[in-house]
Regions:
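Hydrophobic alpha-helical membrane-insertion segments
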Residues: 11-12, 141
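C-terminal motif of bacterial Sec signal peptides marking the signal peptidase cleavage site
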Residues: 16-20
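Mature, Sec-exported extracytoplasmic domains of Gram-positive
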Residues: 22-154
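Positively charged n-region of N-terminal signal peptides that target proteins for export
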Residues: 1-11
Length: 154
């Protein structure tokens, strides 16, 4: 009987330990609000998964949650574009990474044609993938925003 109780206690302890090993839950909309506040971003939010398809060619079925904003054209944030996506699985993450890379390349080409100053800023930005999270952060404070994002998902 003591062996059974000892085994049961050991099993419960193991399950408790492994329960803490899961991925950290993060609300991307709340994180975006924090970024906006911290870095004074004045942007237009994309609200629906249909917007994500319309602007980035990302299928709704690939998205678990997202937050996406584009700086308003008449503000200091006009060249800011922030897209944070948690995908449904690793295959979806690869598809979203491809879609955001295509958008990044389009922004790069546009700035290469019109604005050398903005092109330098875009060159310092990137698309990232970490597990099921994919980001495209373009803006003056992109590096700081990416650090905030990475700290939030770890």
């Amino acid at each position: 009987m003591k062996k059974v109780i000892s085994l049961a206690v050991a099993l419960v302890l193991c399950l408790s330990i492994f329960a803490g090993c899961g991925a950290k839950e993060v609300n991307l909309a709340d994180l975006m609000d924090k970024m906006n506040s911290e870095y004074s971003v004045d942007a237009t939010k994309y609200e629906t998964k249909d917007d994500m398809y319309k602007y980035y060619n990302i299928n709704a079925d690939d998205i678990k949650q997202f937050a996406a904003e584009v700086g308003k054209s008449d503000t200091d944030s006009k060249n800011t574009e922030v897209v944070l996506v948690e995908t449904t699985d690793s295959d979806a993450a690869s598809r979203v990474e491809t879609a955001l890379t295509n958008r990044y390349n389009s922004i790069f080409q546009q700035n290469a044609s019109y604005s050398a100053e903005e092109l330098d800023m875009v060159k310092n930005c990137k698309v990232t993938k970490d597990g099921n999270f994919v980001t495209m952060i373009i803006g003056e404070k992109a590096s700081d925003m990416l650090t905030m994002f990475n700290d939030s998902i770890k």
